[in-house]
Amino acid sequence: MTTNTPTYIELSGEETKISGNLAEGAPMTDLSWAWSSSNACFPETQKEHFTGYHVLYYFDLPSYTEVEIELIPDDVDADFSLYAYEVGQVSENNTVPNLSSCVRCEADHKQDRKIRGRTQDHRRIVKDILAIRNPYQVVIGVVGAQGRAGGKFKLKIKRVE
């Protein structure tokens, strides 16, 4: 699997779960798409959290739907990161690293320092992925931090009421 070939996920019901492995992905040397003002996914100062293998997925987000995406590494000591972005329709031209702009991009990674009111464990959660009037497609990136190239994980996509 190359980094620009996301795997389709069919959402079923209120919650969809899949399993994966970082070894199924590939490194992404150009991360500048992430801190471009047209995407604003994560700042360049946080790029070390996204330097490992990237495994990409995508799914259809119907109108008037909001989802929360949770990444759960099998190894509680593994350092993984997560991002998700919305586009009209997934194509080679808007799949990272070729992403020039998107509707919304959110990311989560291990925090460099403690944040008041937030306890962090090995899980990563991306919120606020939503469609109002228009449906979108959402690309999910599961990434190893610090160059990590392997490790099993589970992804959970849950509809938010």
How would you label these PLM feature ranges?
Residues M1-L11, A23, P27-M28, S32-E161:
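Acidic, Ser/Thr/Pro-rich low-complexity intrinsically disordered segments
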Residues S19-N21:
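Short amphipathic
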